[in-house]
């Protein structure tokens, strides 16, 4: 152990501990901007500088190890002035039009500027007018970037993609897309993890709120909105409400108040996905020689983009089932439109998702009808819908609860857990077991696939089918390791669930941003608790899904089901795909 003194208080910590970590054990707060524990500890921003007795210069606390007898001052006049100077230098190269930024009120630089009383303009605003590319789901705004390198490190260390890189030298240093490409020319998965780890507004999702406001104002359009499972676990965070109070039903009221004609639950489509994907797995499993193995889930568009861009030879291994989002859109513009007696073209379908990659998915050429109309017209992230609610002065804290509309608003516990890593696998196995044996397993029989472990594997025995070898992975860095293991023959699975974001959709790139915090596990626990208390916990027991098959689709994997609910993953190309 190493003993040192910080601001007059003595503490003993393990050798190798940084000054910042040592201070945290004493609950002494040292401000940071670029720091992300175990990911970005490079001292680039120089905001965490501290004074150490015997050192001529101030040192960055985030990457300076403690030493025996060290005496540290975290807020001396010298330290405070240095932080103010460094903040001013950052502001000199930063677009300070905070009222126009989506991160206003939730910006680390803005917070630090206020904390250090840097009021007024200290530099002439003569930043170059650098055009912003708004053609992709992920948008980078050059003049808001503070060169903290977080996006570079998260993309490389967590997601294993290396899309972002440092370019230029000296005052020309900036962050850009590696290999001098545009983002659209790269193999970016649009997972959005760079956005949720950016401390400022340098990265954001493509804002589509204007399109939705226009649709809501158009009396000739019927607006239909679906709410993804993971959204209900996170939207309350913006309002500092208890998740038990900020229920999905209260969100329904908020959306109805905003003006949506129909508010449905993506859980319905998740149950439908299980019926199709589960049936597809059984078909493949019982006719092994006809298919490529293992079978991969296909509901995460970030993962699908990753596979097609990095391991294209495995594209045939993907389930042909569309994601719940896209199944919902297809059913809404066929079955539901028919049910209410309107032309499908009158429907404007909006998805509220925890995901930025969903914005790219809905625009794929394979996700349109024969006339070229998108099944889903617009995708909003959790952050965007809350901005809209705030813009309409809607306060969920005073709203009553309203149930989802029928018939696309019913979901089971199995559907809710789609938003947590392991949830799709768990739900699929529950119904696959029933479809094979005619008997329902215990709802928690497949709990081995749950939890935040980055790579989980299990073997389950299903009577009449034998052993089913499964794996669950989240985070693209972990996914790359799994794919290499499969490719080299080190592992052998039948069914694999992959989610691009660590922790699954609960930690998606469209979720609320809490700087320095990872809340996927917390949100996932909320979803598992909803499943635990649900009256129905099996997708095949969703009565509205049963009615959909009885009245319209006829059967899983049937002709109409295949036409509406399945897709050809070879029907579109990644930028580098031949």
Predicted regions and their residues:
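Residue-level recognition of alpha-helix initiation/capping sites
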Residues: 14, 136, 146, 189, ...
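Iron-sulfur-associated redox domains of electron-transfer enzymes in respiratory
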Residues: 15-69, 75, 79, 205-578
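Short strand-turn-strand beta-turns centered on an Asx-Gly dipeptide
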Residues: 6-9, 53-54
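A short N-terminal beta-strand-loop micro-motif at the entrance of redox/enzyme domains
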Residues: 9-15
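Fe-S ferredoxin-like electron-transfer domains
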Residues: 46-190, 196, 203-218, 222
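Structural motif corresponding to the C-terminal cap of alpha-helices
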Residues: 159, 198, 336-340
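Short structural boundary motif marking the start of a folded domain
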Residues: 1-4
């Amino acid at each position: 152990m190493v003993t040192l003194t910080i601001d007059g208080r003595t503490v003993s910590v393990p050798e190798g501990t940084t000054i910042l970590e040592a201070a945290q054990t004493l609950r002494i707060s040292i401000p940071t901007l670029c720091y992300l524990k175990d990911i970005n500890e490079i001292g680039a921003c120089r905001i965490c500088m501290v004074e150490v007795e015997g050192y001529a210069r101030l040192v960055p606390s985030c990457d300076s190890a403690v030493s025996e007898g060290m005496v540290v001052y975290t807020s001396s006049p010298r330290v405070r002035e240095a932080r103010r100077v460094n903040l001013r230098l950052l502001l000199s190269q930063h677009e300070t039009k905070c009222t126009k930024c989506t991160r206003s009120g939730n910006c680390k630089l803005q917070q630090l500027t206020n904390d250090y009383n840097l009021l007024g303009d200290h530099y002439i605003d003569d930043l170059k007018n650098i055009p912003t590319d708004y053609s992709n789901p992920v948008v980078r705004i050059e003049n808001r970037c503070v060169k903290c390198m977080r996006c570079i490190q998260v993309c490389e260390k967590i997601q294993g993609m290396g899309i972002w890189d440092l370019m230029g030298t000296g005052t020309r240093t900036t962050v850009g897309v590696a290999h001098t490409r545009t983002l659209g020319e790269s193999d970016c998965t649009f997972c959005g993890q760079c956005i949720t780890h950016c401390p400022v507004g340098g990265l954001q999702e493509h804002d589509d709120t204007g399109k939705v406001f226009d649709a809501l104002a158009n009396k000739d359009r019927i607006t239909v909105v679906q709410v993804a499972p993971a959204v209900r676990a996170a939207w309350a965070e913006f309002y500092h409400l208890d998740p038990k109070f900020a229920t999905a039903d209260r969100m329904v009221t908020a959306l109805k108040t905003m003006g949506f004609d129909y508010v449905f639950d993506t859980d319905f489509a998740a149950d439908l996905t299980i019926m199709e994907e589960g049936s597809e797995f059984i078909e493949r499993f019982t006719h092994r020689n006809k298919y490529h193995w293992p079978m991969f889930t296909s509901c995460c568009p970030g993962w699908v983009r990753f596979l097609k861009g990095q391991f294209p030879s495995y594209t045939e291994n993907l389930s042909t089932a569309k994601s719940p989002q896209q199944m919902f859109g297809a059913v809404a513009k066929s079955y539901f439109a028919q049910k209410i007696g309107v032309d499908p073209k009158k429907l404007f379908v909006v998805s509220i998702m925890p995901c930025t990659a969903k914005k790219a998915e809905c625009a794929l050429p394979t996700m349109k009808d024969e006339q070229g109309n998108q099944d889903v017209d617009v995708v909003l992230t959790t952050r965007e819908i809350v901005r809209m609610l705030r813009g309409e002065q809607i306060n969920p804290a005073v709203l009553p609860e309203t149930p989802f509309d029928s018939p696309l608003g019913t979901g089971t516990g199995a559907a809710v857990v789609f938003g947590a890593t392991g949830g799709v696998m768990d739900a699929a196995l529950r119904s696959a077991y029933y479809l094979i044996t005619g008997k329902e397993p215990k709802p928690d029989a497949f709990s081995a696939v749950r939890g935040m472990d980055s790579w989980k594997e299990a073997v389950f025995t299903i009577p009449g089918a034998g052993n089913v070898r499964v794996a669950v992975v989240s985070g693209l860095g972990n996914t790359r390791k799994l794919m290499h293991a499969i490719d080299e023959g080190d592992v052998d699975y039948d069914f694999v669930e992959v989610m691009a974001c660590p922790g699954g959709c609960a930690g998606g790139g469209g979720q609320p941003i809490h700087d320095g915090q990872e809340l996927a596990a917390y949100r996932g626990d909320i979803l598992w608790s909803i499943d635990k208390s649900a009256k129905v916990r099996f997708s095949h027991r969703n009565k509205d899904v049963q009615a959909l098959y009885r009245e319209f689709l006829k059967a899983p994997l049937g002709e109409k089901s295949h036409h509406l609910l399945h897709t050809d993953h070879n029907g579109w190309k990644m930028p580098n795909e031949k």
